[in-house]
Design a protein with these regions (language model features):
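An N-terminal, well-structured beta->alpha segment
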Residues: 1-64, 381
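Catalytic phosphate/nucleotide-handling subdomain of diverse soluble enzymes
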Residues: 267-306
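C-terminal charged capping/lid subdomain of soluble metabolic enzymes
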Residues: 299, 309-382
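Glycine/threonine-rich beta-strand-loop-alpha-helix active-site module
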Residues: 74-179
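Short glycine/serine/threonine-rich phosphate/pyrophosphate-binding segments
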Residues: 18-21, 43-46, 73-76, 99-103, ...
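Carboxylate- and glycine-rich phosphate/diphosphate-binding segment that chelates Mg2+/Mn2+
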Residues: 150-256
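N-terminal small/polar loop signature for handling phosphorylated ligands or for N-terminal nucleophile
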Residues: 42-115, 229-239
């Protein structure tokens, strides 16, 4: 069977990489940028780092800051109109998943106006044309939206997150500069970092995993496990490691999918506005235990990649427990809560479980599941 793999056309990595934004814009003949960035990044001067590069090279732009956490259908529609009004011809997305997802949806709809309702983009979208060109500049080390073919938009009318999968939305250029991530506070660094680890682990054990994706995911697990604690303390080595590790994880999972950790996290964001990385981090160890019977020897590889010693001599039960324990220890060390007690209301579990089962990530789970089993997983976490 043929295996498809989609990546950015061009990516830049390392300190000072944002200078290459101008190089790419000029080389591609772009005229005016529609810069998507959230108000906090603008307030704290993070966005200005990119705007300075544009100004120094006399490149025109329009800044769009109506970016919300967990962007909604309405946010996207507003952005589409703003793009049209600004007379721009490409997008620069600066931020975490929210800015990236908003930019992707705007770019897709501009060139595929038949999807202007936004909701018809859910699932594998049958668009005909590539999005308006996107240059993606992440400011968090977690979502890897700069290298994925996925984006998530919230449908507030149904209290659910729509996972949209479309090869046409991948940014043409990714600029992964750790200096753009240095202002992240500890909590956000921890949450987005655990999101990246979840991508790597779920991608490694997903039903669609194969040799090429396994290579990326194992390396990502190794780098993230070594780097996240340092990144939370804002060390240069930690920041650089996380910038690379989360990108490598994105290269993998974007092409093979995820599992029910993400399926269960998405409705928490839609219903309670729970930060995505926090939800993933809390859910991950419990779902790893649940999925263990369907993972062969892969937990041995995960434990080894996370630095556990003696895995070659462990029994299956021992290395599976070691992998889960290593995830729990990392999560605890970076300050992630241990459960969902302060987030989930028990009366909401039937809705959450059904939403998780219906989520686009669920079919990738290595173990067959049901609404009832997902419900029990939620209950075990409160």
């Amino acid at each position: 069977m043929a295996q498809r793999f989609i990546l950015n056309g061009t990516s830049y990595h390392g300190k000072g990489a944002i200078k290459e934004i101008a190089t790419e814009a000029v080389a591609r003949g772009f005229k005016k940028a529609f810069v998507c960035s959230d108000p906090d990044l603008i307030k704290f001067g993070v966005t200005k780092k990119v705007l300075d590069v544009l100004d120094e090279n006399n490149l025109a732009y329009e800044v769009y800051s109506d970016i919300k956490p967990n962007p909604t259908v309405e946010n996207v529609k507003t952005g589409v109109q703003a793009f049209k009004d600004a007379g721009t011809d490409y997008l620069i997305a600066i931020g975490g998943g929210s800015s990236m997802d908003t930019a992707k949806a705007i770019g897709i709809i501009i060139n595929n106006p038949e999807f202007a309702d936004v909701v018809s983009l859910e699932g594998v979208a049958p668009t005909k044309k590539p999005a308006v060109p996107i240059i993606a500049v992440p400011t968090t080390a977690g979502t890897a939206a700069e290298v994925t073919i996925n984006y998530v938009i919230t449908d507030t009318s149904k209290n659910r997150k729509m996972v949209c999968v479309d090869p046409h939305d991948i940014p043409v250029v990714a600029v992964v500069d750790p200096d753009m991530m240095s202002s992240m506070p500890k909590g956000l660094t921890a949450a987005t970092g655990m999101d990246a680890l979840t991508h790597a682990i779920e991608g490694y054990i997903t039903a669609g995993a194969w040799e090429l994706s396994d290579m990326f995911h194992l390396k990502a697990i190794e780098i993230i496990s070594k780097s996240l604690r340092g990144a939370v303390e804002n060390t240069p080595e930690g920041r650089e490691g996380m910038a690379l590790g989360q990108y490598i994880a994105g290269m993998g999972f974007s092409n093979v999918g995820l599992g029910i950790v993400h399926s269960m996290a998405h409705p928490l964001g839609a219903l309670y506005d729970t930060p995505h990385g926090v939800a993933n981090a809390i859910i991950l160890p419990t779902v790893m235990e649940y999925n263990a019977p369907a993972t062969g020897e892969k937990y041995r590889d995960i434990a080894k990649a996370m630095g556990v010693k003696g895995t070659d001599d462990m029994t299956q039960e021992e290395y599976r427990k070691a992998a889960v324990d290593a995830v729990k220890k990392l999560s605890q060390d970076v300050g992630i809560p241990a459960d969902l007690k302060d987030i989930v209301k028990e009366e909401d579990i039937p809705f959450l479980a059904q939403s998780a089962y219906d989520d686009a990530c669920r079919p990738g789970n290595p173990r067959e599941t049901s609404v009832e089993e997902i419900s029990e997983l939620y209950k075990s976490l409160i």
